[in-house]
Regions:
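Conserved acidic/glycine
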Residues: 1-39, 154-155, 159-163, 181, ...
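Glycine/charged-rich beta-loop-alpha catalytic/anionic-binding loops adjacent to active sites
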Residues: 15, 19-24, 54-63, 103-118, ...
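Active-site nucleophile and cofactor-binding loops and adjacent substrate-binding regions
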Residues: 27-39, 65-71, 96, 106-127, ...
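Glycine-rich ThDP/TPP pyrophosphate-binding loop and its adjacent helix/strand module
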Residues: 54-55, 62, 110, 114-298, ...
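A glycine-rich helix N-cap at a beta->alpha junction
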Residues: 85-97, 172-185, 208-212, 439-458, ...
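Flexible, small-/acidic-enriched active-site or ligand-binding loops
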Residues: 464-467
Length: 562
C-alpha cells in the first residue's frame, strides 16, 4: 500500500507536537513532554504498522494499542484526531475539562479508540499482557482467520519501576506471548529528576531474564524509516514477547525543556510554546492542523484499515458469536436447578459446583488463580492449563502474582470476547486493589473470587484473617461486591456476576456453612430469615456470618431476648 508522502508525514508530526503543547496550555495542566518526544514513533506506528480501521473501531481482529504512561494522553488523543476516530479540534480544545471526550488520562468506553483505562503507572502494561493472553487463546481455539493481531504498549521508566510490571513481564515471558510488543520510552526522567536518583536497573537485562526478545533501538526517535524497521522487527518476532528500547528525549525539540524533568507535567508557557513552534517551523497559532494534512492522514488510515480487514473472516464464527452475546439470567438459573442445596458446603465449594453446572452457557469463561487454584474454588472441571505450548487451555496459572492477575484479568475482559474469573484469598485483595479499582472505572466484566473470607481462617492467624478488606472493596464505585451466606446465595451470586456489565467480587468462605436462605437476597439486596414475636434486637449479617448471627439469635431467644 502507498505510504503518506514525506511532506504529509512531517506535517502530521508537527501537528501532534503542536497539539501536545497547545492542549495543556489551554487546560493549564497536562503532560506534553512525552507526547513531544514520541510524536514520530507514534505517527509511524499508526500510519505504517498498526492494523486498525477508524471506521470499525471495535473490529475484533484489530491491533490493540495501550498507552501505559497514560499521563501522556494528549499523544493518543492527537493520534485519534488525525486518524479519524471521531475526535475533532474542539475536543482537543476541551482537553482535561469536565465532560469532555479528552479526559486527563485515557478512559475505555469514553473515547473511541482507547482500549483500556490507564493512568496509575504499570497498570496498562499488565492490561496489555491480558489482551495478549486473550488473543493467543482465541487464535489457538478458532484459528488465525478469526484472531491474529498484535498488542502494542508504550511504557516509560515509571511503569517499569512499579512492582506490577515485574509480575506481568515475568508472566508474559513465561507464556511466550509473541504477539505482544512493548515500546520502552527510555527518557531517563521522572518528576523528581533523573531516574538515577532512585533506580539503576538494567531494564534490557531484566527483560531478557524474563524471556523477552529485546531490541536495542537506540536514539532513532526522528528517523521514521528506522522506527518502522524496529517496529516491524518486533511485530514479526516469534516465540517471545518483544521489548523495543527506544532512547528518547522528553520535551524535544523545545529549546528550553528538552531532557529536563520540568518538561514532564508543567505546561509550557506561551513564550516557551512559541520558541518550540519556531524550531518546528509551524505558525504561532493555537491548535494548528491544516485541513488537507488531516484529510490525507484520515484517508490513508481508512484505506489501510479496509485492506487489513479484507484479509480476515468477515464475521465471527458461531461459537465466537455466542461468546459476544449475553447469557440470560433465566437460562443460568435453569442450569443451576440441579445443584444440591441439601448439603452443607463451604461457599468456595459451592462456586465450583455452580461454575461447572453452567459451563455450556459460558463458552468464553477462562478461570485462574494466583497459586491457590484448588483452595479458592476456581479449579474448573474439564479445563486444561493455558500455557505457551497449549494456549487453548482455559485454566490460567498466574503464579504468586496477585497484582498482575488483577490487571491481566482486566485486559482479558477488555479484549472483548472472554470472561475472566480469578481467585485468591480475601486478605490478598489488598495486593490487587489498584487493578480492581481500574476494573470498575473501565466497566470490565472480570469476576474476582476471594475465599477464606473471615476470622474463620482460624489457625492461620491475624495475618490471613481479612477484617478491613470487605469495607475496602465495598467503597469502590462500580464494583459489585457479593458475599453469599450459603450454597443457594452462591448460585445466585454466580448468575449476578455473569449478567453484570462490570466487575464483580465474590466473597466466599473457607469453612462449611449451613443452608439458611432461599437465595433471593442476592437479587433484592437483603432478606429477613428469622423473625421474633417480641422483637427487641435486630441482628444483621452477611456471608459466613449469617449462620453465626442465627445461632446468636437462638441464644438470645433462650435468654428471653427477642
Amino acid at each position: 500500500m502507498a505510504r503518506l508522502t514525506p511532506e504529509i508525514d512531517a506535517d502530521a508530526i508537527r501537528i501532534i507536537r503542536g497539539l501536545a503543547m497547545d492542549a495543556p496550555l489551554a487546560a493549564k495542566s497536562g503532560h506534553q513532554g512525552t507526547a513531544l518526544a514520541l510524536a514520530p514513533l507514534a505517527h509511524v506506528l499508526y500510519s505504517r504498522v498498526l492494523s486498525h480501521d477508524p471506521s470499525q473501531p471495535k473490529w475484533l481482529n484489530r491491533d490493540r494499542f495501550i498507552l501505559s504512561n497514560g499521563h501522556a494522553s494528549i499523544l493518543q488523543y492527537s493520534l485519534l484526531f488525525l486518524n479519524g476516530y471521531g475526535l475533532e479540534l474542539e475536543d482537543l480544545r476541551a482537553f482535561r475539562q469536565m465532560g469532555s471526550a479528552t479526559p486527563g488520562h485515557p478512559e475505555n468506553g469514553h473515547t473511541p479508540g482507547v482500549e483500556v483505562t490507564t493512568g496509575p503507572l504499570g497498570q496498562g502494561f499488565a492490561n496489555a499482557v491480558g489482551i495478549a493472553i486473550a488473543e493467543s487463546h482465541l487464535r489457538a481455539r478458532f484459528g488465525a482467520k478469526q484472531f491474529d493481531h498484535h498488542t502494542w504498549v508504550i511504557a516509560g521508566d515509571g511503569c517499569f519501576m512499579e512492582g506490577i510490571s515485574h509480575e506481568a513481564a515475568s508472566l508474559a515471558g513465561h507464556l511466550k506471548l509473541d504477539r505482544l510488543v512493548c515500546i520502552f520510552d527510555d527518557n531517563g526522567i521522572t518528576i523528581d529528576g533523573s531516574t538515577g536518583l532512585a533506580c539503576s536497573d538494567d531494564v534490557s537485562q531484566r527483560f531478557k531474564a524474563y524471556g523477552w526478545n529485546v531490541i536495542e533501538a537506540g536514539d532513532i526517535g526522528e528517523n521514521l524509516d528506522a522506527l518502522e524497521r524496529v517496529l516491524q522487527e518486533g511485530r514479526d518476532h516469534r516465540g517471545q514477547p518483544t521489548l523495543i528500547r527506544l532512547r528518547t528525549h522528553i520535551g524535544y525539540p523545545s529549546p528550553d525543556f528538552t531532557d529536563r524533568h520540568e518538561a514532564h507535567g508543567n505546561p509550557f508557557d506561551v513564550a516557551a510554546t512559541k520558541r518550540t513552534k519556531d524550531v518546528l517551523g509551524i505558525p504561532d497559532e493555537p491548535f494548528w492542523a491544516p485541513q488537507e494534512v488531516v484529510a490525507a492522514v484520515r484517508q490513508h488510515a481508512l484505506a489501510r484499515g479496509s485492506a487489513a480487514r479484507s484479509k480476515m473472516d468477515a464475521q465471527p464464527n458461531a461459537e465466537v458469536a455466542r461468546m459476544l452475546g449475553k447469557v440470560s439470567a433465566d437460562d443460568l438459573r435453569k442450569s443451576l436447578d440441579s445443584l444440591p442445596h441439601d448439603k452443607d458446603l463451604a461457599t468456595r465449594q459451592s462456586i465450583t459446583l455452580a461454575v461447572g453446572a453452567s459451563l455450556d452457557l459460558v463458552p468464553g469463561l477462562v478461570a485462574g488463580s494466583a497459586d491457590l487454584t484448588g483452595n479458592t474454588g476456581v479449579k474448573v472441571p474439564g479445563f486444561t492449563a493455558f500455557s505457551a505450548n497449549a494456549p487453548e487451555g482455559r485454566q490460567v496459572y498466574y503464579g504468586i502474582r496477585e497484582h498482575a492477575m488483577g490487571a491481566v484479568m482486566v485486559g482479558i475482559a477488555l479484549h472483548g470476547v472472554l470472561t475472566p474469573m480469578g481467585g485468591t484469598f480475601f486478605v490478598f485483595a489488598d495486593y490487587m486493589k489498584p487493578a480492581i479499582r481500574l476494573a470498575a472505572l473501565s466497566r470490565s466484566r472480570a469476576i474476582f473470587v476471594f475465599s477464606h473470607d473471615s476470622v474463620g481462617v482460624g489457625e492461620d492467624g491475624p495475618t490471613h484473617q481479612p477484617i478491613e478488606q470487605l469495607a475496602s472493596l465495598r467503597s469502590i464505585p462500580g464494583l459489585r461486591v457479593i458475599r453469599p451466606a450459603d450454597s443457594r446465595e452462591t448460585a445466585e451470586a454466580w448468575v449476578a456476576a455473569l449478567t453484570h456489565d462490570g466487575p464483580t467480587a465474590l466473597i466466599l468462605s473457607r469453612q462449611t456453612v449451613p443452608n439458611v436462605t432461599d437465595g433471593s437476597a442476592v437479587r433484592h439486596g437483603a432478606q429477613v430469615i428469622r423473625e421474633s414475636s417480641r422483637p427487641q434486637v435486630t441482628l444483621i449479617g452477611t456471608g459466613s456470618e449469617v449462620s453465626v448471627v442465627l445461632r446468636a439469635a437462638e441464644e438470645l431467644d433462650s435468654r428471653g431476648i427477642g
